[in-house]
A protein has these predicted regions:
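A compositional/biophysical signature of low hydrophobicity enriched in polar/charged and small residues
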Residues: 1-147
Length: 147
């Protein structure tokens, strides 16, 4: 879907605060409420807007550890392994990557014990040859609201 300037402005408003009313977005963008509603509907139908949610402070929820885990998978079973890993509620992202490893996992944990259990579960999965886990010391930026 091609986005024009109005679409981008609407999206920026939604990214700023998804609770903005259509009337508020229309006022901010300088278009009618009908335009805002129809553009949002088109972007939802096209799959550009996948949903609306709150942005949580994970540390305040007790998730003290963020990890980046590289995995190497054998026998061409990468997609199967990734789908299984993605089911874990602590996993925030699973990515195919280039380089020495096959995939990267971003996950958050409340304790070292939880991280240890997760690592053991990974190594118990068929076709995982090895893992390499990096514990994040400081999060400088974590924001997936791109536009």
């Amino acid at each position: 879907m091609e986005l024009n300037e109005t679409d981008n402005k609407i999206l920026k408003n939604l990214l700023e605060d998804a609770r903005f009313s259509s009337r508020q977005i229309a006022k901010n963008v300088g278009v009618s409420v009908g335009t805002v509603l129809s553009r949002i509907k088109k972007m939802e139908d096209a799959g550009l807007i996948k949903g609306y949610s709150a942005i949580l402070n994970h540390e305040k929820l007790g998730y003290e550890l963020t990890v980046v885990t590289e995995i190497t998978v054998s026998k061409g079973r990468l997609v199967e392994v990734e789908k299984e890993i993605a089911k874990n509620p602590n996993v925030c992202g699973v990515y195919d990557v280039t380089g020495l490893t096959d995939a990267v996992i971003i996950a958050k944990f409340k304790s070292r014990e939880d991280l240890g259990r997760f690592t053991k579960q990974l190594l118990a999965l068929p076709y995982i040859e090895r893992t390499n886990t990096h514990v994040v010391l400081t999060t400088v930026k974590e924001n997936f609201r791109l536009l």
